[in-house]
């Protein structure tokens, strides 16, 4: 059992973590054993190294830490009923973390169940977790942008090189005609 001072320190530490997190996902871990939670954490580490954490946190501690971090906890009070585990991402792609926990939940037949999440400070309901898990990762989005920009540039290069080739052919034809 934690003393009041320890709880206050924990709230302070968690509020700092939540301030720096791009993703805070709330889930009900009921039905998962320690080995399964460890497996989920391992999968998160494989994708995001130490940038993501999945922790079982007491409801009152999570509530106070989020409130201290500046989140509007009154709008999400139903999140703080029942068992609570929080996935937060301080460093790395939050969409990748959502994909990992969503795939794990599908694999475990809906466990852990989702209660909602904050993504870059905006709250999304539990129903939207599936849609967010289908979004491309930051790396994929950057690749799409690069290929989108690269296409017209390649076209311009091809047009210019084609024009230069045609000019070269014309000059060669003139040279051949004059040499005859």
Swiss-Prot record:
GO terms for cellular component: large ribosomal subunit. The keyword Ribonucleoprotein applies. One of its GO terms (molecular function) is structural constituent of ribosome. Pfam families: Ribosomal_L10. Part of the ribosomal stalk of the 50S ribosomal subunit. The N-terminus interacts with L11 and the large rRNA to form the base of the stalk. The C-terminus forms an elongated spine to which L12 dimers bind in a sequential fashion forming a multimeric L10(L12)X complex. Forms part of the ribosomal stalk, playing a central role in the interaction of the ribosome with GTP-bound translation factors. This is Large ribosomal subunit protein uL10.
């Amino acid at each position: 059992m934690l003393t009041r001072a320890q709880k206050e320190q924990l709230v302070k530490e968690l509020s700092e973590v939540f301030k720096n997190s791009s993703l805070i996902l709330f889930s009900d871990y009921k039905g998962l054993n320690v080995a399964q939670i460890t497996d989920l954490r391992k999968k998160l580490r494989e994708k995001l190294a130490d940038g993501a954490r999945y922790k079982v946190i007491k409801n009152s501690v999570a509530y106070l830490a989020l409130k201290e971090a500046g989140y509007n906890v009154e709008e999400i009070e139903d999140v703080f009923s029942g068992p609570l585990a929080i996935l937060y991402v301080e460093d790395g792609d939050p969409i990748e973390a959502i994909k990992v926990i969503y795939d794990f939940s599908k694999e475990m037949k809906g466990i852990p169940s989702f209660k909602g999440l904050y993504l870059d400070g905006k709250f999304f309901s539990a129903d939207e977790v599936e849609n967010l898990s289908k979004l491309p990762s930051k790396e994929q989005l950057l690749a799409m942008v690069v290929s989108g920009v690269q296409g017209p540039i390649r076209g311009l290069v091809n047009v210019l090189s084609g024009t230069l080739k045609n000019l070269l052919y014309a000059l060669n034809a003139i040279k051949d005609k004059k040499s005859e």
